[in-house]
């Protein structure tokens, strides 16, 4: 048991999906998993364990932002021995060729957060995905015909940015899109020597201004979820 996860020892699988939205966690459990047990409801942040294609897997909501992701990733690793963490979330696209509903595999994460400037004493740490998860996820996505886009993304501490042109700098340097958690996930995974990966579905677009609905973000984007789960099965 940890401060924010009220689960007994052994209740959480070694491989876990991490949606930000706890209702998406419930949707994944209800849609894809068998023999499901809810192990956490603390703060309304649902966690479930079940089986997918015969393999034990968990799914845990993390909330929004780097601090919240940091809490859940740390507790899952330290208190429950989780070894493989795959974030399944949404992002805004920075580049025209990456369309709404496209699948992004985040190879690395830039950030405006101070999460790494403090422990690294002002020096820059480059948070990157685990190749042991990235490679099979990419292969599985291609096999399924999803045409994944692989590259860097931007993890921002600011959702409502007063600088409406700032995103263009990140796009110029190759960032495919923006979300709010991956830099923390990759950093914490590196700290503890475990595997982490982020899969993102594009929910809105900075260039075309196309958006998806809140309901669609919560209950669809199944391609991303299938790729994440099949990656775990193939570990």
From Swiss-Prot:
CDD domains: PNP_EcPNPI-like. Phosphate binds at residues 20, 24, 43, 87-90. InterPro entries: DeoD-type, Nucleoside_phosphorylase_CS, Nucleoside_phosphorylase_d, Nucleoside_phosphorylase_sf. Its EC number is 2.4.2.1. A purine D-ribonucleoside binds at residues 4, 179-181, 203-204. The record marks 217 as: Important for catalytic activity. It catalyses: a purine D-ribonucleoside + phosphate = a purine nucleobase + alpha-D-ribose 1-phosphate; a purine 2'-deoxy-D-ribonucleoside + phosphate = a purine nucleobase + 2-deoxy-alpha-D-ribose 1-phosphate. Keywords: Glycosyltransferase, Transferase. GO terms for cellular component: cytosol. GO terms for biological process: purine nucleoside catabolic process. Pfam families: PNP_UDP_1. Homohexamer; trimer of homodimers. Catalyzes the reversible phosphorolytic breakdown of the N-glycosidic bond in the beta-(deoxy)ribonucleoside molecules, with the formation of the corresponding free purine bases and pentose-1-phosphate. Belongs to the PNP/UDP phosphorylase family. HAMAP family: Pur_nucleosid_phosp. This is Purine nucleoside phosphorylase DeoD-type. It comes from Clostridium tetani (strain Massachusetts / E88). The lineage of its organism: Bacteria, Bacillati, Bacillota, Clostridia, Eubacteriales. The gene is deoD.
């Amino acid at each position: 048991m940890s401060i924010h996860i009220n689960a007994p020892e052994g209740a959480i699988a070694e491989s876990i999906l991490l949606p930000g939205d706890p209702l998406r966690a419930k949707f994944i459990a209800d849609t894809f998993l068998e023999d499901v047990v809810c192990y956490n409801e603390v703060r309304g942040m649902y966690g479930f364990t079940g089986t997918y294609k015969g393999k034990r897997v968990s799914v845990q909501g993390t909330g929004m932002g780097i601090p919240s992701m940091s809490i859940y990733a740390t507790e899952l690793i330290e208190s429950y021995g989780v070894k493989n963490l795959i974030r399944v979330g949404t992002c805004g696209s920075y580049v025209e060729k990456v369309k709404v509903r496209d699948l992004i595999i985040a190879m690395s994460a830039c950030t405006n957060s101070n999460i790494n400037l403090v422990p690294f004493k002002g020096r820059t740490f480059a948070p990157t995905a685990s190749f042991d998860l990235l490679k099979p996820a990419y292969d599985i996505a291609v096999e399924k015909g999803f045409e994944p886009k692989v590259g860097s993304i931007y993890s921002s501490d600011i959702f409502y940015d007063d600088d409406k042109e700032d995103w263009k700098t990140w796009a110029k340097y190759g960032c495919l899109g923006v979300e709010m958690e991956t830099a923390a996930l990759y950093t914490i995974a590196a700290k503890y020597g475990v595997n982490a990966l982020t899969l993102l579905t594009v929910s809105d677009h900075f260039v075309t201004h196309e958006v998806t609905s809140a309901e669609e973000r919560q209950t669809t984007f199944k391609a991303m979820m299938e790729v994440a789960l099949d990656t775990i099965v193939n570990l």
